[in-house]
Amino acid sequence: MAHCVTLVQLSVSCEHLIDKDIGSKSDPLCVLLQDVGGAWAELCRTERVRNCSSPEFSKTLQIEYHFETVQKLRFGIYDIDNKTPELGDDDFLGGAECSLGQIVSSQTLTLPLMLKPGKPAGRGTITVSAQELKDSRVVTMEVEARNLDKKDFLGKSDPFLEFFRQGDGKWQLAYRTEVVKNNLNPTWKRFSVSLQHFCGGDLSTPIQVRCSDYDSDGSHDLIGTFHTTLAQLQAVPAEFECVHPEKQQRKKNYRNSGTVRVKTCRVETEYSFLDYVMGGCQINFTVGVDFTGSNGDPSSPDSLHYLSPTGVNEYLTALWSVGSVVQDYDSDKLFPAFGFGAQVPPDWQVSHEFALNFNPSNPYCAGIQGIVDAYRQALPQVRLYGPTNFAPIINHVARFAAQAAQQRSASQYFVLLLLTDGAVTDVEATCKAVVDASKLPMSVIIVGVGGADFEVMEQLDADGGPLRTRSGEAAARDIVQFVPYRRFQNAPRETLAQTVLAEVPTQMVSYFRAQGWAPLKAPPTPGKGPAQAPQA
């Protein structure tokens, strides 16, 4: 079993950001990046806060904390003026670098924002506080309001809610809803937020709810406020009067500025990757190796399949890197391994899913070393040919994943590792295979070996939006992760694995959550403690 790490939640706020927008304040967003083998990789980002030079971000940033590793982090603040996810066309308001260890040991760390080394971003600062996520429970709530005060001269109010928890003698933002335009009787979208972040895990923690009218210049008008606790919010249908303190003092017959009604409020367990793995889910690992002619003659030192005097090449290095991590999650350590794009004996027909051990009824290899041995033995026995077709192997693994899904339990998940030297040939068939597989307990990892153009692979990765078939059917979720091997060839071997496997836990959990499947063995529920409602 791999080492279990602690999940840390980072809350971010900034002060005195420089203004890049003419006539208004910036619309800041915070991006968190981590140093991965000398390259900065984005982990997550907060929401955008409109027209604010001292934002307190509602969305937290979550990261796994490894005591044994120096985890270098970079926080980037950007002024977002468009809807594209890319940041290259947005103004950079400043950044700061530190390690996660620094934040954890300080609990709250304030750093000056820098435009570049030696050049401060005005008086801008960033404050990051860390909180260990010990509780996997989430608060799920659905809220509406009725008869809110009209705040806009030419229209109705544009209301939104903010929930603040009391802590360290001040009110800390826990959640902010979306804005409902021009509506005095709004219903906000259902939302979920971690119990720890919402109320520190304590159902009796004072909660302040503020209802405000959104203004594009950032000068939001207070409609009303009320105080409560999560325990009271759970007593649905719960109704609270929104009171404007100044109106209450000025007007003798003032009653309220509207009411907020909690339609649903539940505390639910949000299972993690470790919950599923430790609950008994097996991760089934399958390997597919590219034996197309573009790799070059294996006997030539220029070939990607050429085995060096030490018996390795890029294919084997990538296989070891990823396989050595994944094999810890498979109890029998028997892995099916296939080749594709080669002419195979005895009839020398081109095959796109031949067993590396030439035993189609039992293609399993004992451990990663077994795959390596089968690869080395197969190499001189096949003729490299083509084309580069992925669909047959993806569909092969998908058939097993479909059988597992029929059990309707979180018992198995499938990871297919494809090692290839070039662009896929059967693009349409592969897109359809991936879209079909996205409905199954399965992920696909593609490692590009060599220096070819891998643009088509980036399309399969679909980071810019859901992958679609030619007929327009969209993938149910993103299940493909592609990386070119040579980006990591000078980095420690574990760096490649960390990158290509980074999305698998999220992909696995998203599938099981969508199906509504709990871990086979549910984790113990928290006992009596701060997260329990007060006793009468």
UniProtKB/Swiss-Prot annotation:
Domain (VWFA): give its ranges: 284-504
Q: Does the keyword Cell membrane apply?
A: yes
Query: Which Gene3D superfamilies does its entry note?
Result: C2 domain
Assembly behavior: Homodimer; homodimerizes via its C2 domains. Interacts with p65/RELA (via N-terminus); this interaction induces proteolytic cleavage of p65/RELA subunit and inhibition of NF-kappa-B transcriptional activity. Interacts (via VWFA domain) with ACTB, CCDC22, MYCBP2, PPP5C, RDX and UBE2O.
What's its job? Calcium-dependent phospholipid-binding protein that plays a role in calcium-mediated intracellular processes. Involved in the TNF-alpha receptor signaling pathway in a calcium-dependent manner. Exhibits calcium-dependent phospholipid binding properties. Plays a role in neuronal progenitor cell differentiation; induces neurite outgrowth via a AKT-dependent signaling cascade and calcium-independent manner. May recruit target proteins to the cell membrane in a calcium-dependent manner. May function in membrane trafficking.
Q: What is this protein called?
A: Copine-1
**Which GO cellular component terms are attached?**
cytoplasm; membrane; nucleus; plasma membrane
Per the database record, which ranges form the C2 domain? Answer: 1-113, 122-244
